[in-house]
Amino acid sequence: MSRAGEPVLELRDLHKSFAETPIIRGVTMVVRRGQRHGLIGPNGAGKSTLFNLISGQFAPTFGDILLNGQSIAGVPPYLINRRGLSRSFQITNLFPRMSVAENLRIAVMGHHGHRFTLFRPVANLRRVSSRVDEHLEKLRLQHRRNDMAGDLAYSEQRALEIGMALATDPEILLLDEPTSGMSRDESAYVVELIREVTEGKTLLVVEHDMSVVFDLCDHTSVLVYGQILASGAPETVRADRRVQEAYLGEEAA
């Protein structure tokens, strides 16, 4: 029986306050299986806070977060990851003094239940090595396999981090501003790479750059002052007058 289109991630009347200041104010949103869902909003909209609520960095003040129908509100990040949610960070989160292949190997080993140890010939684990090779090819990093992760270009580092997140074979992948700090060419490269490596997968992309979301995603939600202002197909959201006024500006009208 096909599971396409069923809810993978659900936010139900989600609230988050710090002290007496409300940041997230009643967000309800659904990400469905196979969907590429983009979340955009101006600076200060609450995007990072919402992202951290979903990934377990923060516990909600009120409301619920469901992953495949089970509540993950307030669950530690490592347990959320085990349940099938993987994320990349706005700032690269790699092992800079290890090679590209070693970074991927650690991610693959963790997914298959192996521990990284100096006393075990992990490179000889055929399944792990095969998966590492597959990811290197998908990420277009075969020629960089033995280079230190810290020596990669910034766009290559982001590609590697996304690959490490995908190596856990998640139910849903969360990307936090994957093109932040990139030139136009680097951004185009990373967007195309994300499109290729996440084909058929469920994706939630948090972005400030609306062009990235409109180019990559098939569903878009707009967060303004901690509330969902609009949600739907990218072309519908782009044409929404409220969105133009709140986020895109009159020049987008």
Spans of features found by a protein language model:
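Glycine-rich phosphate-binding loops of nucleotide-dependent enzymes
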Residues: S2-A253
